[in-house]
Amino acid sequence: MSESVHTNTSLWSKGMKAVIVAQFLSAFGDNALLFATLALLKAQFYPEWSQPILQMVFVGAYILFAPFVGQVADSFAKGRVMMFANGLKLLGAASICFGINPFLGYTLVGVGAAAYSPAKYGILGELTTGSKLVKANGLMEASTIAAILLGSVAGGVLADWHVLVALAACALAYGGAVVANIYIPKLAAARPGQSWNLINMTRSFLNACTSLWRNGETRFSLVGTSLFWGAGVTLRFLLVLWVPVALGITDNATPTYLNAMVAIGIVVGAGAAAKLVTLETVSRCMPAGILIGVVVLIFSLQHELLPAYALLMLIGVLGGFFVVPLNALLQERGKKSVGAGNAIAVQNLGENSAMLLMLGIYSLAVMVGIPVVPIGIGFGALFALAITALWIWQRRY
């Protein structure tokens, strides 16, 4: 049954609760599945360099479908798009459980995630508006952060107990998300009847990319956020190999605990940025970006668990302080030039392309036999230099 949109819809309406629950379960599954599947690769004696390939097939789906998923979200009821996307994730996780190639199953999850992303943000504006919309976005981000923390840890802890149990828990989470999506009101499509000419859709998307790249502020933001998230994903995989070498700990849970420290730090840094940085003073965030690389370098040399926890939380604080102002700048300037939806789609393309590139370089470094500690040192140094170059470039323009 279709329901009309009411601008004064309660923040805790049935539909909004369903969206938040679905988002939590879907993000929980995403983060738990990564570490559960990494544990499966270890158990099945896949080479170490294959671990980042797992994430590469995931982000590859984002890149491949980037020009089209926004229109999919606008052409159908967003709650149903979310349900279909979570269904794809469920299919991918279940296929890994039943012994299908993990890279194939994880690719299916990536396709689902690519379709899910624009729908989950777009539906908030259809369920509520005004000050409630800001609060709804806050609830969405809070549920996502909680899911990242709990999902990452659950994936590692359950995998230490039994890999199949961890994978089944991920499939169960996606199944719960599908059920939650059923309770989202079937709202009218935002822009029905659009052309599905793939060439025109791709051309329109590329025009948005060109427009944002030609603007100095949005170009600066795109490069900065892409470098940050590319580095963040690479750090996740670096930790998986670094923990047994530097700390002598071989379980699956410890890397997830360390990743959780970064997520907690990002929340703290984001809060500080909201108070200390404005769109007019975005350059204040740049020293934090440079320090991320420096602290990663120092972290790579550690051999004790407590300093590792502290340094990773510091990396998260610096990361939150760095990336939040850049996101705000892109959303504000992009909204005026190509529209907020297109700006987010282009940003997703940039960030996932950076992830693909950095993970590819990291995988190659592991494949040729470079030890993980020197990889971490080089990674930190190169990131610091890249952000320094970006800052100099921004000041020139």
UniProtKB/Swiss-Prot annotation:
Cytoplasmic topological domain residue ranges: 39-52, 112-144, 188-226, 278-280, 326-343, 388-397
PANTHER family: MACROLIDE-EFFLUX PROTEIN (PTHR43266), MAJOR FACILITATOR SUPERFAMILY (MFS) PROFILE DOMAIN-CONTAINING PROTEIN (PTHR43266:SF2)
Cited function: Catalyzes the facilitated diffusion of 2-acyl-glycero-3-phosphoethanolamine (2-acyl-GPE) into the cell.
Family indicated by similarity: Belongs to the major facilitator superfamily. LplT (TC 2.A.1.42) family.
Domain of life: Bacteria
Keyword Cell inner membrane: yes
Protein name from the UniProt record: Lysophospholipid transporter LplT
Principal cellular location given in the protein's record: membrane
GO annotations of cellular component type: plasma membrane
